[in-house]
């Protein structure tokens, strides 16, 4: 049921407006601080019970210079590029020669279908991509 009047209208005039004892509702001091204040002090048992993973670090953090990040392209996308612009790619024994590095990529991944034979030159090639390229009579050259 929807109230026609706000509850505060009824409560007005009473000392605490429905808040119980006047000592309650006194602000953050009444709660032991705002938010996670006291997490290492008086709220420690609450942290242990309800948020046990709140503090601490887990796992390994590698230095950014050690992480090798290669630009990737899928075999299906590579074929689409070749089919859209066939005159841009050289042909060698009826196979398109695709230098992935010239296209701005380094690694070839195996998502998609391959229907035309290609000679793919790349820094790295995944196993699935290699299988798909060689299944239609293509070759893979790792640089």
Swiss-Prot record:
<dbReference type="GO" id="GO:0015934">
    <property type="term" value="C:large ribosomal subunit"/>
</dbReference>
<keyword id="KW-0694">RNA-binding</keyword>
<feature type="region of interest" description="Disordered">
    <location>
        <begin position="1"/>
        <end position="39"/>
    </location>
</feature>
<dbReference type="Pfam" id="PF00828">
    <property type="entry name" value="Ribosomal_L27A"/>
</dbReference>
<keyword id="KW-0687">Ribonucleoprotein</keyword>
<dbReference type="InterPro" id="IPR030878">
    <property type="entry name" value="Ribosomal_uL15"/>
</dbReference>
<protein>
    <recommendedName>
        <fullName>Large ribosomal subunit protein uL15</fullName>
    </recommendedName>
</protein>
<dbReference type="GO" id="GO:0019843">
    <property type="term" value="F:rRNA binding"/>
</dbReference>
<keyword id="KW-0689">Ribosomal protein</keyword>
<dbReference type="GO" id="GO:0006412">
    <property type="term" value="P:translation"/>
</dbReference>
<dbReference type="InterPro" id="IPR001196">
    <property type="entry name" value="Ribosomal_uL15_CS"/>
</dbReference>
<feature type="compositionally biased region" description="Gly residues">
    <location>
        <begin position="29"/>
        <end position="38"/>
    </location>
</feature>
<dbReference type="InterPro" id="IPR027386">
    <property type="entry name" value="Rbsml_uL15_N"/>
</dbReference>
<dbReference type="GO" id="GO:0003735">
    <property type="term" value="F:structural constituent of ribosome"/>
</dbReference>
<dbReference type="InterPro" id="IPR021131">
    <property type="entry name" value="Ribosomal_uL15/eL18"/>
</dbReference>
<comment type="subunit">
    <text>Part of the 50S ribosomal subunit.</text>
</comment>
<comment type="similarity">
    <text>Belongs to the universal ribosomal protein uL15 family.</text>
</comment>
<comment type="function">
    <text>Binds to the 23S rRNA.</text>
</comment>
<keyword id="KW-0699">rRNA-binding</keyword>
<dbReference type="InterPro" id="IPR036227">
    <property type="entry name" value="Ribosomal_uL15/eL18_sf"/>
</dbReference>
<feature type="compositionally biased region" description="Basic residues">
    <location>
        <begin position="1"/>
        <end position="13"/>
    </location>
</feature>
């Amino acid at each position: 049921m929807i109230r026609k009047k706000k509850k505060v209208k009824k409560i007005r005039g009473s000392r605490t407006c429905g808040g119980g004892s006047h000592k309650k509702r006194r602000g953050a001091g009444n709660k032991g601080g705002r938010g996670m204040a006291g997490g290492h002090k008086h709220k420690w048992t609450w942290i242990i019970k309800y948020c046990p993973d709140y503090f601490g670090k887990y796992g390994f953090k590698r230095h950014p210079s050690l992480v090798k990040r290669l630009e990737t392209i899928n075999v299906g996308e590579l074929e689409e590029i070749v089919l859209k612009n066939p005159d841009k790619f050289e042909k060698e024994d009826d196979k398109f020669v695709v230098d992935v590095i010239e296209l701005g990529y380094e690694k070839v991944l195996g998502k998609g279908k391959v229907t035309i034979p290609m000679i793919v030159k790349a820094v790295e090639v995944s196993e699935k991509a290699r299988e798909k390229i060689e299944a239609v009579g293509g070759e893979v050259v790792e640089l």
